């Protein structure tokens, strides 16, 4: 094969290019630049190489940071029971977009069971209404989500749901879909003023049972600390818009959980205390659990004291400088309440790509009670 042709257009001067060759036709047939067959093959190779180069560049642009993201298919999350009500709220197509999660559609339309990407069952309705799960209509491989924000002490009947659910949505940090009651977020605006304090301690409680640890602790505190009790249990209920301004007048708020369980930190801490501007005195999981969510100097844990009397003395004798130190976090952080079930369910879409499809909770009761 002759590759020394001086002209690539098929009109080379063979005698000039190769004066030592006497058979010009043989030379022409073997010249890549002159033979039309070889020219077509060469141009074909060039075109193929160019196509491969374009494909490679397109892949590279999509794979590097800042490249055009691949469009994500819209996920449909079916809510079988809307929590605590027979009617779901309005669920528009952009519901999850409001919470920063695109390509996610929530629906309470049970006719979508066959096509939904995941189905959510809230335990309270399973527990109180004895609703029948649509096991005979379940599509093969469809993930089912068990959801609750209640403590194990108030969650019953889990033995009936062995080997059914794939994922768990709850306040537990080891849940597949972790949804706390609240969190602290970075905040760069001006520090909000601390409400004026005129009273010592407040407690809002609706379900007061003497057998509960919080009731026992309150009985021990009461002789040493002035605590104003609100809620149905005391006959002094507060309207929804009255709770925060009422608690804001108090220096401390008793954030006593109704039961003490792993990661169980509810609105009694996030809303009733932190959002209201009172220092939370907490009874719940260990101090280390609270410190996973907030700075260690943002709350007072009852476990840090040997007795209720010692705790009361600490609260009553606290000077103003020490008291204001519990609000240092407000200079850079703010409370974000996560009490909207729509946002909680939208979180499923954010976690969906990372969750194992083949996982099954064979003993949901043992896992949740642990």
UniProtKB/Swiss-Prot annotation:
Q: Which molecular-function annotations from GO does this UniProt entry contain?
A: 4-galactosyl-N-acetylglucosaminide 3-alpha-L-fucosyltransferase activity; alpha-(1->3)-fucosyltransferase activity; fucosyltransferase activity
Q: How is its activity regulated?
A: Inhibited by NaCl. Inhibited by GDP in a concentration dependent manner, with an IC(50) value of 93 uM. Also inhibited by GMP and GTP. Inhibited by N-ethylmaleimide. Activated by poly(ethylene glycol) by enhancing the thermal stability of FUT7. Activated by Mn2+, Ca2+, and Mg2+. Both panosialin A and B inhibit activity with IC(50) values of 4.8 and 5.3 ug/ml, respectively. Inhibited by gallic acid (GA) and (-)-epigallocatechin gallate (EGCG) in a time-dependent and irreversible manner with IC(50) values of 60 and 700 nM, respectively.
Q: Which residues are glycosylated?
A: 86, 109, 319
Name a single GO cellular component.
trans-Golgi network
Keyword Iron listed = no
Protein keywords: Disulfide bond, Glycoprotein, Glycosyltransferase, Golgi apparatus, Membrane, Signal-anchor, Transferase, Transmembrane, Transmembrane helix
Q: Does the entry annotate any disulfide bonds, and if so which pairs?
A: 96-104, 239-242, 346-349
Fetch the Pfam families from UniProt: Glyco_tran_10_N, Glyco_transf_10
Post-translational note: N-glycosylated.
Which regions of this chain are Lumenal-facing, per the record's topological domains? 60-370
Taxonomy, superkingdom: Eukaryota
- Keyword check for Disulfide bond, yes or no: yes
This enzyme catalyses: an N-acetyl-alpha-neuraminyl-(2->3)-beta-D-galactosyl-(1->4)-N-acetyl-beta-D-glucosaminyl derivative + GDP-beta-L-fucose = an alpha-Neu5Ac-(2->3)-beta-D-Gal-(1->4)-[alpha-L-Fuc-(1->3)]-beta-D-GlcNAc derivative + GDP + H(+); a neolactoside IV(3)-alpha-NeuAc-nLc4Cer + GDP-beta-L-fucose = a neolactoside IV(3)-alpha-NeuNAc,III(3)-alpha-Fuc-nLc4Cer + GDP + H(+); a neolactoside VI(3)-alpha-NeuNAc-nLc6Cer + GDP-beta-L-fucose = a neolactoside VI(3)-alpha-NeuAc,V(3)-alphaFuc-nLc6Cer + GDP + H(+); an alpha-Neu5Ac-(2->3)-beta-D-Gal-(1->4)-beta-D-GlcNAc-(1->3)-beta-D-Gal-(1->4)-[alpha-L-Fuc-(1->3)]-beta-D-GlcNAc derivative + GDP-beta-L-fucose = an alpha-Neu5Ac-(2->3)-beta-D-Gal-(1->4)-[alpha-L-Fuc-(1->3)]-beta-D-GlcNAc-(1->3)-beta-D-Gal-(1->4)-[alpha-L-Fuc-(1->3)]-beta-D-GlcNAc derivative + GDP + H(+)
Q: Which InterPro entries match?
A: Glyco_tran_10_C, Glyco_tran_10_N, Glyco_trans_10, GT10-like_C_sf
Q: Please name the SUPFAM superfamilies in this protein's record.
A: UDP-Glycosyltransferase/glycogen phosphorylase (SSF53756)
Task: Note the coiled coil stretches, chain numbering.
Answer: none
Q: Per the annotation, which location comes first and is thus the protein's main one?
A: Golgi
> EC?
2.4.1.-
Q: In which pathway is this protein known to take part?
A: Protein modification; protein glycosylation
Sum up the protein's function in the record's words. Answer: Catalyzes the transfer of L-fucose, from a guanosine diphosphate-beta-L-fucose, to the N-acetyl glucosamine (GlcNAc) of a distal alpha2,3 sialylated lactosamine unit of a glycoprotein or a glycolipid-linked sialopolylactosamines chain through an alpha-1,3 glycosidic linkage and participates in the final fucosylation step in the biosynthesis of the sialyl Lewis X (sLe(x)), a carbohydrate involved in cell and matrix adhesion during leukocyte trafficking and fertilization.
Q: Which PANTHER family match?
A: ALPHA- 1,3 -FUCOSYLTRANSFERASE, ALPHA-(1,3)-FUCOSYLTRANSFERASE 7
Name this protein carries in UniProt: Alpha-(1,3)-fucosyltransferase 7
């Amino acid at each position: 094969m002759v590759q020394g042709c001086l002209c690539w257009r098929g009109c080379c001067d063979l005698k000039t290019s190769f004066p030592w060759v006497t058979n010009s036709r043989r030379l022409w047939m073997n010249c890549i630049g002159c033979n039309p067959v070889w020219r077509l093959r060469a141009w074909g190779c060039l075109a193929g190489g160019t196509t491969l180069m374009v494909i490679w560049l397109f892949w590279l642009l999509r794979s590097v940071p800042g490249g055009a993201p691949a469009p994500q298919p819209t996920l449909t999350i079916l809510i079988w029971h809307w929590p605590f009500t027979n009617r779901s709220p309005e669920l528009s197509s952009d519901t999850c977009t409001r919470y920063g999660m695109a390509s996610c559609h929530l629906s309470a339309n049970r006719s979508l069971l066959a096509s939904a990407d995941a189905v959510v069952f809230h335990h309270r309705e399973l527990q109180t209404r004895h609703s029948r799960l649509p096991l005979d209509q379940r599509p093969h491989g469809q993930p089912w989500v068990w959801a609750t924000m209640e403590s194990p002490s108030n969650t019953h009947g889990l033995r009936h749901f062995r080997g059914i659910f794939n994922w768990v949505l709850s306040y537990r940090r080891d849940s597949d879909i972790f949804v706390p009651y609240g969190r602290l977020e970075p905040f760069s605006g001006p520090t909000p003023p601390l409400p004026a304090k005129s009273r010592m301690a407040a407690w809002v409680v609706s379900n007061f049972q003497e057998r509960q640890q919080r009731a026992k602790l309150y009985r021990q505190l009461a002789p040493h600390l002035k605590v104003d009790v609100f809620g149905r249990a005391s006959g002094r209920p507060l309207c929804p818009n009255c709770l925060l301004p009422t608690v804001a007048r108090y220096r401390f708020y008793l954030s006593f959980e109704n039961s003490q369980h792993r990661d169980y930190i509810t609105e009694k801490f996030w809303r009733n205390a932190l959002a209201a501007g009172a220092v939370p005195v907490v009874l719940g999981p260990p101090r280390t659990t609270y410190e996973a969510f907030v700075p260690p100097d943002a709350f007072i844990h009852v476990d840090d004291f040997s007795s209720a009397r010692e705790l009361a003395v600490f609260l009553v004798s606290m000077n103003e400088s020490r008291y204001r130190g519990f609000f240092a976090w407000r200079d850079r952080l703010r409370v974000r309440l996560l009490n909207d079930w729509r946002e909680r369910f939208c979180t499923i879409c954010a976690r969906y790509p990372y969750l194992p499809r083949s996982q099954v909770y064979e003993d949901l009761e043992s896992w949740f009670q642990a």
